[in-house]
Amino acid sequence: MALVLVLNSGSSSIKFQLVDPTAHATDDPFASGLVEQIGEPQGRVTLKHAGEKFVVEAPIPDHSAGLALAFDLMGEHKCGPTDVEIIAVGHRVVHGGILFSQPQVITDEIMDMVRDLIPLAPLHNPANIDGIEVARKILPDVAHVAVFDTGFFHDMPPAAAIYAIDAKTAADHGVRRYGFHGTSHEYVSHKVAELLDLPEGAINQITLHLGNGASCAAIRGGKAIDTSMGMTPLSGLVMGTRSGDIDPGIVFHLHRQAGMSIDEIDELLNKKSGVKGISGVNDFRELRTMIDAGDQDAWLAYNIYIHQLRRYIGSYMIALGRVNAITFTAGVGENDVAVRADALSHLEGFGIKIDPERNALPNTGPREISTDDSAIKVFVVPTNEELAIARYAKALSGA
């Protein structure tokens, strides 16, 4: 079996999957795992393979040691590089800037270009680079492919991509809307075309990637024309711990009046805001339990979340003019029945009708949750970014 190793390297973790790029979207990966607590006194590698789970705990000083330990564990359980045919390695890279609209076979020149983008993603791209460098050393004889989170939004119309600030300042410092979760939005939009049995060029759709991070996209004829995240993943929808859209003047106010540093405000808006900032929790299952128990802060957090979601859905319906489908994906979007119903509950005037029984069905795969006579189809489509990355990697590797 020809497999692609898919890596998602974070600052202190590495997610990995061995994926058959020809597999069905609902198939489990051949193997998957997580290296975590890199740089801490005690790290952990978890591997899932053949219906079993294996865990090793050991010091993991850096990404190189973490990936080596993961490969050792995979080898012990007959799914390592010497046991299976790895035809390519696909790497998730968060920020491609204006340089990359498509996945790229990684060369030394491409690596230099990705390094140049670190100022745009100082929390993410360095970790992505670490993972690529380590993997290229361990697997030097296969193609390594970078798939950029921003790529799908690269060619948005200027009216959506350009911020109304001094043009020279923006150009000098790379300030514009880049968008994120692009691999997920693109993957889901392809699935919607299959569900509608229409060519993508004939479809206008809104995709809602609702996880701890959340974003939405307006897609016309297979091309993104707008998205909620901006220069960074902080803007747009209310998220688990991120504020989403706020008045930029709040940053100045907190700096001047509260004496908060830029780093403190960064931490506040990225890690201590959103649903967690209002309710104290960012897990929607916990939030629902608190709401059911009568917790008013939880109820307020939920209402703010839904209010912002409706605002974006409504504005994208106007931007698109005609909408064939609205689709929910990612952890909250795929599993939270109430969020889906409430997000669309004030849009009946557009002819959107949710079927409560269909909406309440468990998350078993792509499915329609609107009524047969709904003017706009509503779908739930489980995202599979790893499979999308694996398919890109296979295609570009020539294997």
UniProtKB/Swiss-Prot annotation:
ATP binds at K15, H209, L210, G211, N212, G213, D283, F284, R285, G331, V332, G333, E334, N335. The active site is at D149. Its EC number is 2.7.2.1. The keyword Transit peptide does not apply. Pathway: Metabolic intermediate biosynthesis; acetyl-CoA biosynthesis; acetyl-CoA from acetate: step 1/2. Its main location: cytoplasm. Homodimer. This is Acetate kinase. The gene is ackA.
